[in-house]
Curated annotation (Swiss-Prot):
Function field: One of the primary rRNA binding proteins, it binds directly to 16S rRNA central domain where it helps coordinate assembly of the platform of the 30S subunit.
Protein name per UniProt: Small ribosomal subunit protein uS8
One GO cellular component term noted in the UniProt record for this chain: ribosome
PANTHER family, alphabetized: 40S RIBOSOMAL PROTEIN S15A
InterPro entries the record matches: Ribosomal_uS8, Ribosomal_uS8_CS, Ribosomal_uS8_sf
Amino acid sequence: MSMQDPIADMLTRIRNGQAANKVAVTMPSSKLKVAIANVLKEEGYIEDFKIEGDTKPVLELELKYFQGKAVVESIQRISRPGLRIYKRKDELPKVMAGLGIAVISTSKGVMTDRAARQAGLGGEIICYVA
């Protein structure tokens, strides 16, 4: 059986990995997952990520902890295959009053809500991270 929502699977692996105090989590790689991982790394929610393998690439995320607690408090899928959520630049949400981020897929690539607002872009809201 094929996976219906690979992005939700990625977010669940991060959530479960941090709940179990894992150092790293692995998952099948894709361009969108790598772009999301890059945003999470830039924002300081994960330590690092790397891609291994040629025929079937595997994405490995190194999870981040601060004083023994997971840095990612909550990670939530918003737009999903059955119900896509798109917002214009003036409708972009602020997660936890600006303390968290919304990961958004725009025409210029995957970025945070802050970067999309500065660039004057809207797009599909992939997930919220706090």
